[in-house]
Amino acid sequence: MLLQGTHRIGRMAMLLALADESESSVLSIPKGWKYCTGKVGSMNSQKVVAAMETAAKSNQVIETDVYRETHALYHAIMEALYGVTRGQIQLADVLRTVGLRFAIVRGTPYDGKKEGEWVAVALYGTIGAPVKGSEHEAIGLGINHI
């Protein structure tokens, strides 16, 4: 059960989230892996989760009718949000807003086929008061098995 050096799913998700549109085209995604990227901004954490889940489903990163895939994605999203919000997933309740780029990557990071597929969610952007200029950069990463 070795993690393949060229198949680091979390690193790939982070690079995609950090990359500008022109930079993401030069990243080498392992064969058979799926991914999507997007942007979301809101004071409502439910909207942030819903936007990422919708992107993953509409880009066929996860199957819409398989519960375990949606469940794995949800937990990876929540883990990434914990990183961005420093463990407090409240936004509007404490007058915070986020503007994030996200990447969702699905693949097989381990040598052994028995380890199966994993999903990684990376978030990068800003968090702060809902006043222009009152925010700072934040980053989060979540990884879960499917």
From Swiss-Prot:
Any Pfam family: HutP
Gene3D superfamilies with a match to the protein in the record: Hut operon regulatory protein HutP
Domain of life according to the entry: Bacteria
Keywords carried by this UniProt record: Activator, Histidine metabolism, RNA-binding, Transcription, Transcription regulation
InterPro entries for this protein: Regulatory_HutP, Regulatory_HutP_bacillales, Regulatory_HutP_sf
Disulfide bond annotation, renumbered to this chain: none
GO terms (BP aspect): L-histidine metabolic process; positive regulation of gene expression
An annotated Gene Ontology molecular function: mRNA binding
Family: Belongs to the HutP family.
Quaternary state and interactors: Homohexamer.
NCBIfam families named among the record's database cross-references: PRK03065.1
Function: Antiterminator that binds to cis-acting regulatory sequences on the mRNA in the presence of histidine, thereby suppressing transcription termination and activating the hut operon for histidine utilization.
Protein name as annotated: Hut operon positive regulatory protein
